[in-house]
Amino acid sequence: LFQKKINFHNLGYIIIDEQHKFGVKQRKNLSDKGGNNCDVLLMSATPIPRTLIMSIYGDMDISIIREKPKNRKEVITYSKLESKIKDVINFVKKEIDNGNQIFWVCPLIEESKKVDHESAVKKYKYLNEIFPNTVDIIHSNIDKYKKEEILSKFLNKKFSILVSTTIIEVGIDFPNANVIIIENANKFGLSQLHQLRGRVGRGHKQASCILMFKSNLSENARKRINILKNSNDGFVISEEDMKLRGFGDLLGFKQSGLKNYKLADPIHNADLFKLGEMEILRIEKEEKNINRYKSLLKLYDQADIINDII
């Protein structure tokens, strides 16, 4: 769809689901195919910082659906040192005894000499020794038909634990899966962790997410884990993500990055920006004599206004 050689006849409406999966340039290339009369709807459980700040600046209208589907409970999120894996195994045993299923997510398929991350294959072998005949594995190197077979078996409760890479991040719906364990959680971004956590809690039972980490956590990684533990709201998580990572370049293609402001900061003064947007709309609709704002507009055009104020 993004390729130049693909043209549309009278493209008028574009819906982009999981918008954080696409780059700024990709989204722009697609919307350009519709011209000036094309409407674009972006959908995501966790908007990227750049999208969030555009809504604050008034460049994008935003609708928030905060209600969960009926009978769904909040996912309880825990954090656990990887050295305490025996506690996690005991928890998993109880969940299996209660008829529940588990996702176990690892960042890599195979072990890497360069990166000290837990691999899915290694974890599969480890869990298969503890829970024989109740574990299977899925990752991107498995062919399409085998993946479908494994997922079908998991859906029909043929086994209890599915070890996986982040391939399950989107498009997976298994109501009986009530636990997700994420290895090396400190290596994932907030949006990805929230998306992975969303794979559980789709039934009526209480669901749990366990974020496993090594002892040498960075300050930002510790903040990310605490944010996930304290909130299930994707919009709140996106706001916190924006505070940590910044929002990038609004006029370019960078989707994150911190900016310095001498006056109002759109991250910490979001309410002020919204108030300003509402006032601009009111002036456009109600004010007939724009001349009363000449002095203000003149100040705005002066390059040294900020230095003068400070």
Placement of each model-derived feature along the sequence:
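Inter-lobe coupling/hinge segments of SF2-like helicase ATPases
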Residues: 1-226
